[in-house]
Amino acid sequence: MKLAVYGKGGIGKSTTSCNISIALAKRGKKVLQIGCDPKSDSTFTLTGFLIPTIIDTLQAKDYHYEDVWPEDVIYQGYAGVDCVEAGGPPAGAGCGGYVVGETVKLLKEFNAFYEYDVILFDVLGDVVCGGFAAPLNYADYCIIVTDNGFDALFAANRITASVREKARTHPLRLAGLIGNRTKKRDLIEKYVETCPMPILEVLPLIEDIRVSRVKGKTLFEMTESEPTLQFVCDFYLNIADQLLTQPEGVIPRELGDRELFNLLSNFYLNSSNSTNTTLKNETNLFDLV
């Protein structure tokens, strides 16, 4: 099974990806996580350091694939999850899709691309140009990480359009949305009501999720010294269990930008007005007492 994780930049894709990878490993699967971001920090919380990228390694070997060995680019992280960082082209030049293609090509040279139960692509931000949509060419499922905000849902909608387009020529489905670190889920639910798709999980606003990134550890590793965090790990285990059932998934239908803006803004404004009216009525009742 091959997964591609997308979402707005800074939404917590890498943190989510690393914890899902471990959850899948905890369920007995052999997992490879491939970071597809020029920052090359997707697997940081799995390994505890920034591993060499495939592109940097190939450049050092003058692109002689026969001189590159699996141990040069594949590093084992926490819970036995194997890690690869694709790297990226020089700033302002090249294409991220080419980098992903070179990564897959090299892994196939090692016969490694097919020896894993699960391969998870953690992909740069919300860029859905042909290049950074390249991991969708290899994926069985796309997962979108979002929160309950306008910007993240706009990004999710654009990614949804990319999934629909790729599904025309590839056996790709959207597994669903993951809400990350959010107090509410009303905007997410409103969006899903209009564009039907599964919600795999909504993680609460827990500071330890963000702190884990700073510490260079996953929630699972932090739980070893802080057992009270086990309930957070259970969210990721639930996501893993859903994915391992190989869900049918959906070919989503995105909204137009203006349509989405009107949907979310009207819902938000109506909710705010309703809250204000309720507060005003409660104040009037208090005055009567």
From Swiss-Prot:
Its cofactor is [4Fe-4S] cluster. InterPro entries: NifH/chlL_CS (IPR030655), NifH/frxC (IPR000392), P-loop_NTPase (IPR027417), Protochlorophyllide_ATP-bd (IPR005971). One of its GO terms (biological process) is photosynthesis, dark reaction. The gene is chlL. It comes from Tetradesmus obliquus. One of its GO terms (cellular component) is chloroplast. It is found in: Plastid, Chloroplast. Signal peptide: none annotated. Mg(2+) binds at residue 14. This is Light-independent protochlorophyllide reductase iron-sulfur ATP-binding protein. Binds 1 [4Fe-4S] cluster per dimer.
